[in-house]
Amino acid sequence: MKAWPNEKKNGTGLYRSRFARILIAYMALMFLSLATKPAIAAAEDEVRATFDRFVAAQNAHDIKAVESLLLSSPDFLWITRGTPIWGHDAALKRFTALYDGTWRLDPEPSGLKITMISDGVAQVYIPIIFTIGATGQAAQQTKFLMNQVLVKTADGWRVSSILPIPVPPQ
């Protein structure tokens, strides 16, 4: 094996040189890993803020604000009461109908879990109480496990799918 210019012929320098290279590589990986943590935390904060705006828009029955938070795509998917609603426009039509009655979301912030699937895709999970009632009918509260997938677009994070799973009565 060829020795580096600063290595001794007896191998001691070779050992030190290899150790130094391994140590440098390890340190570089450590710093790289530390640098990605703030980026992940920043993305999670952006996703959390988008979810908070989604809840506020829902509770205000602000269809324009909801529209701006949904992915504008025919591939947007919302599964409600076992029925898939495909597409941005169909979802807005359904939300508009629900807003005629009682429609309120009360998330349980302590249960919020955001999983970054990739740089531009996040999964949101949170227990949430839905208060729902058709026009002229008494509203009922139901606990759901809300699942959403958000994607990052040029305009920011957008909800690309919504899957609320009802929690069975205990």
Descriptions of predicted regions:
Residues M1-F19:
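N-terminal secretory signal peptides that target proteins for export/translocation
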Residues A28-L69, S73, Q170:
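Short, low-complexity N-terminal intrinsically disordered segments enriched in polar/charged residues
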Residues D45, I63-I117, Q141:
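A solvent-exposed, acidic/Ser-Thr-rich amphipathic alpha-helical stretch
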Residues F95, P109-I114, I128-F130, L145-V151:
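Hydrophobic/aromatic beta-strand elements that line small-molecule binding cavities or substrate pockets
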Residues T102, F130-Q140, P168:
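Short, cysteine-centered beta-strand-loop-beta hairpins and adjacent loop/turn segments enriched
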Residues I114-A122, L150-G156:
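A short, structured loop/turn motif at beta-sheet edges
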Residues G120-F130:
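A short hydrophobic beta-strand element
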Residues K143-Q170:
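Short beta-strand edge/turn micro-motifs at domain boundaries
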